[in-house]
């Protein structure tokens, strides 16, 4: 099931399902996230910080229900009455902010990743991940539009403001390992630069991520960190060494603009180019894995086709998530908070 399909299933979850999900999150992780971000509740409230965290996750799991319904279904209010005014829940979310949800997402992702990798197959000796971007639409309020803008920019008229996220996914479990959020003025490459990647890994990218600066920096993010993607049709290169039929070590120029933005870049950089016939069409793939004996061309191409083009749902998201999933928050800080809640909820669904 794709990421989009899993996010869509959040429309049908019951309170019993959420109770099951709560068993997957150690309360100490929530408390640690609140303490680390300075958001732990000191005074007694009807909606203490720990409950507000669950409220935000619940909003992702009950996407078609009003906020008061989520509060009541999850029995979040402390005290004799289980009712809480909608304005009070908004204030509680504002007090919490986005930081505890972002911290909790990273805590859960890293903790679950360690357990998942023990049971998963690797490509040779490498863990396999994938990166791509997602766009969310939100209510058209002055604050949201001023902060986020849209794909048409902040000056042009647009139906909905939009937020961008770039995610790192485990291609076997389909759990999200890391994510970076931003407004529409920040491109996917900008956000992807901020991702953290585990060591001893290969990450699959769409062609939109082809950049000498980005890909070389990706290799430096962690020990033995590599990448694989489809090659652009207009790729400029010269062959340094021919490994075999349709398999080459190549050298490519680094643009003057890239060198100006990053003076540490040289004038050229190297990678491996592989050409194959797939479904009657010629396809080219480029990778940082240049050891042809350890990483045969056929296995690399198969890895990309099976793990990216067939299994992953990222491309579905880019074309349809904007219409299929509307955020509800009317303030930028709460938009970010809500997205972190959605990402946590998505990973919970993957683990059930």
Where are these regions (language model features)?
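Noncatalytic, basic helical substrate-engagement surface that gates or grips nucleic-acid strands
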Residues: 85, 130-131
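Major-groove recognition helix of helix-turn-helix-like DNA-binding domains
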Residues: 81-98
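DNA-recognition alpha helix
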Residues: 65-82
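Glycine/small-residue-rich loop that forms an oxyanion/phosphate-binding "nest" at active or ligand-binding sites
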Residues: 115
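Single, function-defining residue in the core of a domain
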Residues: 1-67, 93-96, 103-112, 123-127, ...
């Amino acid at each position: 099931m794709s990421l989009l399909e899993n996010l869509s299933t959040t429309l049908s979850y019951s309170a019993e399902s959420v109770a099951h999900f709560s068993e997957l999150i150690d309360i100490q992780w929530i408390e640690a996230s609140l303490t680390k971000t300075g958001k732990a509740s000191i005074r007694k409230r009807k909606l203490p910080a720990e409950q507000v965290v669950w409220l935000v996750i619940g909003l992702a799991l009950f996407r078609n229900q009003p906020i008061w319904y989520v509060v009541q279904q999850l029995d979040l209010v402390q005290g004799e009455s289980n009712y809480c005014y909608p304005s009070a829940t908004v204030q509680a979310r504002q007090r919490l902010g986005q930081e505890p949800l972002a911290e909790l997402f990273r805590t859960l992702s890293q903790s679950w990743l360690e357990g998942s990798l023990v049971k998963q197959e690797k490509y040779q000796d490498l863990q396999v991940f994938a990166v791509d971007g997602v766009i969310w639409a939100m209510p058209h309020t002055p604050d949201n539009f001023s902060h986020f803008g849209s794909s048409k920019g902040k000056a042009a008229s647009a139906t909905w403001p939009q937020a961008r996220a770039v995610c790192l996914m485990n291609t076997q479990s389909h759990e999200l390992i890391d994510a970076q959020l931003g407004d529409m003025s920040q491109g996917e490459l900008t956000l992807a630069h901020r991702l953290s990647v585990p060591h001893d890994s290969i990450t699959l990218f769409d062609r939109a991520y082809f950049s000498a600066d980005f890909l070389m920096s990706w290799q430096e993010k962690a020990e033995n960190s590599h990448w694989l993607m489809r090659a652009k049709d207009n790729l400029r290169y010269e062959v340094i060494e021919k490994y075999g039929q349709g398999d080459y070590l190549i050298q490519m120029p680094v643009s003057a603009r890239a060198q100006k933005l990053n003076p540490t870049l040289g004038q050229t950089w190297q990678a491996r180019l592989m050409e194959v016939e797939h479904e009657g069409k010629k396809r080219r793939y480029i990778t940082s894995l240049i050891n042809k004996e350890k990483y045969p061309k056929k296995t690399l191409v198969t890895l990309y086709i099976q793990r990216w083009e067939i299994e992953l749902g990222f491309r579905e998201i880019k074309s349809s998530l904007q219409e299929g999933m509307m955020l509800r928050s009317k303030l930028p800080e709460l938009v970010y908070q809500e997205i972190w809640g959605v990402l946590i909820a998505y990973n919970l669904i993957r683990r059930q």
